[in-house]
């Protein structure tokens, strides 16, 4: 009996994880002057409080995930540096 309850709870937990996809919010900005491009983060570890490192035309910024697709997560990588990008 206990194993059946555990199996059902486990299945419900996995199902809720699959159905609750999270995304970076879509940026309202479509373009940015090169002199204004700034990276506040390069990877999710650079952000705090459950926020993600999301890419925008003006650089990478820590944003809280949303359930609406459209945004883009920052790719990071060795060439990514925080601060202004010239």
Swiss-Prot record:
Keywords: Antibiotic, Antimicrobial, Disulfide bond, Secreted, Signal, Toxin. It comes from the Eukaryota. Contains 5 disulfide bonds. The keyword Secreted applies. Transmembrane segments: none annotated. GO terms for biological process: defense response to bacterium. The keyword Secreted applies. This is U15-lycotoxin-Ls1d. One of its GO terms (cellular component) is extracellular region. Residues 21-66 form the WAP domain. Expressed by the venom gland. It is found in: Secreted. One of its GO terms (molecular function) is toxin activity. It comes from Lycosa singoriensis (Wolf spider). Its main location: secreted.
């Amino acid at each position: 009996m206990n194993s059946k309850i555990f199996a059902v709870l486990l299945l419900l937990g996995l199902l809720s994880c699959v159905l609750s996809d999270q995304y970076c919010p879509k940026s309202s900005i479509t373009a940015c002057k090169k002199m204004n491009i700034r990276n506040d983060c390069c990877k999710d570890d650079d952000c705090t409080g459950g926020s993600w490192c999301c890419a925008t035309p003006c650089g990478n910024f820590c944003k809280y995930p949303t359930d609406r697709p459209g945004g883009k997560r920052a790719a990071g990588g060795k060439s990514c540096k925080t601060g202004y990008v010239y």
